[in-house]
Amino acid sequence: MEVVAAAILKNNINDYDSFCLTHANANNMKVNAADPLNWGVAAEAMKGSHLDEVKRMVEEYRKPVVRLGGETLTISQVAAIAAHDGATVELSESARAGVKASSDWVMESMNKGTDSYGVTTGFGATSHRRTKQGGALQKELIRFLNAGIFGNGTESNHTLPHTATRAAMLVRINTLLQGYSGIRFEILEAITKLLNNNITPCLPLRGTITASGDLVPLSYIAGLLTGRSNSKAHGPSGEMLNAKEAFQLAGINAEFFELQPKEGLALVNGTAVGSGLASIVLFEANILAVLSEVLSAIFAEVMQGKPEFTDHLTHKLKHHPGQIEAAAIMEHILHGSAYVKDAKKLHEMDPLQKPKQDRYALRTSPQWLGPLIEVIRFSTKSIEREINSVNDNPLIDVSRNKALHGGNFQGTPIGVSMDNTRLALASIGKLLFAQFSELVNDFYNNGLPSNLSASRNPSLDYGFKGSEIAMASYCSELQYLANPVTTHVQSAEQHNQDVNSLGLISSRKTKEAIEILQLMSSTFLIALCQAIDLRHLEENLKNSVKNTVSQVAKKTLTIGVSGELHPSRFCEKDLLKVVDREHVFSYIDDPCSATYPLAQKLRQVLVDHALVNGESEKNSNTSIFQKIATFEEELKTLLPKEVESARTAYENGNSTIANKINGCRSYPLYKFVREELGTSLLTGERVISPGEECDKLFTAMCQGKIIDPLLKCLGEWNGAPLPIC
């Protein structure tokens, strides 16, 4: 019996697969019989490194043409069209037949008197109503859905950003091209012309719950296409246009469209606004995720961190791919870094100068970022599936001669993906804030000045103190935004739409989170560049101090009063050890001050040598104690001048020692910030404020200018961690 049952089951499955393949072929769908639930496709999409995927996104973003066929649209293509950065849209001619077939089916069905939702019936909870005036019904649909508020003439702006509207238009075209919606191809061509001529309908910012799709905002696109008097659009230069002017400027030669049965529903009953904005958000989120990995590596460099936190074995044993990749990227940046080499010498020389292990914000950054990158990557794939989905209702199945009433308009993938992405962004922001807080705190930053102040007089330079307060503000708001949107669903439309995704609301909040994380990333990178320059200044100042102490020691401690060699000559080596070990910025504003550690410890070296000088101390010719005053007086005469000379040379670009960053893999980002954006070391002596420099970088980041230098930092990475050896 079991064998017979198995055979019957196998035959039934084969019959089912055969039916699916036949039906798929009839509708130009791609279905894999071996993967009917699509898990295999989803898993396949996650193969390869995240960085390679980001590189592909950037490459796609920069292509001049986006060809729509309904199944291959990517978030980077949506972001490119949304930005209107020169890319144009082309429709696949091969889709025309399928689109026409579904449109014809609707008309034939209506002519036969077939009862169909939204064609001969009312909508939602009032779908029990009936009408034979299909065109009038679509017109009324658009009228009652024009329920948005724009707040024209008020200080607040309640219009959806142009980029989000353009993204929605592109995604909606892509959905309708698949031929399941019952709309004319000519309408899709008209929307394409609006996009290519940079004519953007005005959509309300609020008013959708993204189930049944984004009804209210999408109705304003339909309103423009049908020439409603309240429809407005922005032209290429931002000028306000009515529907007639928009058509003329876009080169749409047809009259306003008289919607046929189902066409109004096809235009509005979809998730395009939420998923379109989500696509823009995720393009930025993926870039920011890679940036956070590189910033963490630069943080390790300037903090004199121990690079073993990136060792592949540690992360291999944890198994999480996001963590393994984050560690490998940081390892690549740190491998061969001059900062890491110097830090190693420092740790060997005096292992007690800092904690044995770096603090969590540095040491566990791969473990922290890894899961967040996985979340962002999974959300990206989820939204890419959504923008290539058919997400309206009912669906026209021409091959089976029926309309399917379902709920693909439910935008749960958008709401959930955006909530998850926002949580990931908030966690990235928390890490950057923790790293920033260590960087500006002289108790934790291994010798950098408090607040990263770079002036000669620290009492009149508070560096990044204001920026730290701003970072706390940014981080707090970002943490607040991490709260989920999808837990705040309200039953709508006479309890017909009793569960709904809130997809667009979640996308909007995630866009806010992106902007705040860009503010944080900009501020942090400016601070890191300040720290890089301070390490350069520190090295030159220390070199000057060391040379001067050596010179003074040779002059005052080598020879006695009668020309004989003096026992104090053996102090020089220990004096130079003091210079090596003492943090430069703890004394450099007044290097010979008796209240500062350098002068105190130099004196202590001489005292210690005197104490072991024994009987020789009783002889004025061999006494080390009697040399202390001579040494200190000579040092006071010479050292301040040499320090000032070294600082002046640094400021004039004539440093004795070159900046270590020049030979590091993180250099492209530093070069971008300093040379391309024209920023420089901030000091209290200069008028320019931290906010001005951060603003330059934030603007450049929003314009995508940081992408190339960021990827250049990782240009030599082969996609694998260093071998365990």
Swiss-Prot record:
Which InterPro entries does the record associate with it? Aromatic_Lyase, Fumarase/histidase_N, L-Aspartase-like, Phe/His_NH3-lyase_AS, Phe_NH3-lyase, Phe_NH3-lyase_shielding_dom_sf
Q: State the GO CC annotations.
A: cytoplasm
Q: Which Gene3D superfamilies match?
A: Fumarase/aspartase (Central domain), Fumarase/aspartase (N-terminal domain), Phenylalanine ammonia-lyase 1, domain 3
Cellular compartments annotated: Cytoplasm
Please list the residues that carry the modification 2,3-didehydroalanine (Ser). Answer: S212
The record describes its quaternary structure and partners as: Homotetramer.
Q: Locate residues linked as 5-imidazolinone (Ala-Gly).
A: A211-G213
Which residues does (E)-cinnamate bind?
Answer: N269, Q357, R363, N393, K465, E493, N496
Alphabetized, the UniProt keywords read:
Cytoplasm, Lyase, Phenylalanine catabolism, Phenylpropanoid metabolism
UniProt pathway annotation? Phenylpropanoid metabolism; trans-cinnamate biosynthesis; trans-cinnamate from L-phenylalanine: step 1/1
| Source organism of the structure | Trifolium subterraneum
Keyword Ion transport applies: no
The catalytic activity, as recorded, is: L-phenylalanine = (E)-cinnamate + NH4(+)
Descriptive protein name: Phenylalanine ammonia-lyase
Entry similarity comment: Belongs to the PAL/histidase family.
GO terms (BP aspect): cinnamic acid biosynthetic process; L-phenylalanine catabolic process
